[in-house]
Amino acid sequence: MSGSETGLMAATRESMQFTMALHQQQQHSQAQPQQSQNRPLSFGGDDGTALYKQPMRSVSPPQQYQPNSAGENSVLNMNLPGGESGGMTGTGSEPVKKRRGRPRKYGPDSGEMSLGLNPGAPSFTVSQPSSGGDGGEKKRGRPPGSSSKRLKLQALGSTGIGFTPHVLTVLAGEDVSSKIMALTHNGPRAVCVLSANGAISNVTLRQSATSGGTVTYEGRFEILSLSGSFHLLENNGQRSRTGGLSVSLSSPDGNVLGGSVAGLLIAASPVQIVVGSFLPDGEKEPKQHVGQMGLSSPVLPRVAPTQVLMTPSSPQSRGTMSESSCGGGHGSPIHQSTGGPYNNTINMPWK
């Protein structure tokens, strides 16, 4: 066999091998079209056989999921391979389409498509209304704590309304006690004494240590303090007055005496008294008496400053003021009596 024939046979053999290789390649590409696109074709070898170069895959480490503090509004930022993502993105946008055809000659060796979220993509935030707001709806019923305030006031006792101050002037020779009690004749108002100033010439005090229970002093005494109250009570249609006065007096020599007033309290000079009247809780003042309280008071008869109480059980006596209300020694009470017109001041019948 000549050399030309040998070369022709070798060329024919190589062309047949190349044709068979191309035929096998076409069958393999039809079975796996997707893989053939991602595999670059290169011609190598001594006989010109087509070879397929396996692309290098760059395996990226899986990104850890980090929950967002926003709850349901959190957005997942993950890089998924192109073959596993299915063309979906985390933001709900349109799927990314793959390019068909032969890959670029000078493109990257990796055949994966990296799908990631745009870091600058806007995230949607849903604001939830606060649970504490009621939409401005007004609640019905009694506000909390109002009932407890009423219970606290009831524990302090009954309350009065319509407090009105009065300034009374008692002339010399008039009874201070009668002047104060005259305010209660105009209606169901209670009276309380706040202060007083002036001089007293005759006073009868209640002292249980003495034999008679009361003692009367004559002279000139300055009022240090005067307090007390008078309140009207109605029981079975009958009205009665309860209350009384307490006084503290100072003599010219500096001695102090005082106690509960059990008789007359005669003024030695004009006495100014500040009192207050009010309506007790649960009582109403008649309309015809509104505004008439304190405008006028009955004129009381004058009593001589030197008058001493006369009682059936004890004779009249005169003397100087005692240093002690209990008597005995150098200074003894000038007059003691077992009874008098003011001994029942705590509960007097209504006129």
UniProtKB/Swiss-Prot annotation:
Residues 60-77, 310-325, 334-351 have a biased composition (Polar residues). SUPFAM superfamilies: AF0104/ALDC/Ptd012-like (SSF117856). Residues 23-37 have a biased composition (Low complexity). It is found in: Nucleus. Residues 97-109, 138-149 bind DNA. Pfam families: PCC. InterPro entries: AHL, AT_hook_DNA-bd_motif, PPC_dom. Transmembrane segments: none annotated. Keywords: DNA-binding, Nucleus, Repeat, Transcription, Transcription regulation. Residues 1-151, 310-351 are annotated as: Disordered. GO terms for cellular component: nucleus. It comes from the Eukaryota. CDD domains: DUF296. A motif (Bipartite nuclear localization signal) lies at residues 97-105. Residues 159-301 form the PPC domain. GO terms for molecular function: minor groove of adenine-thymine-rich DNA binding. Transcription factor that specifically binds AT-rich DNA sequences related to the nuclear matrix attachment regions (MARs). The PPC domain mediates interactions between AHL proteins. This is AT-hook motif nuclear-localized protein 10.
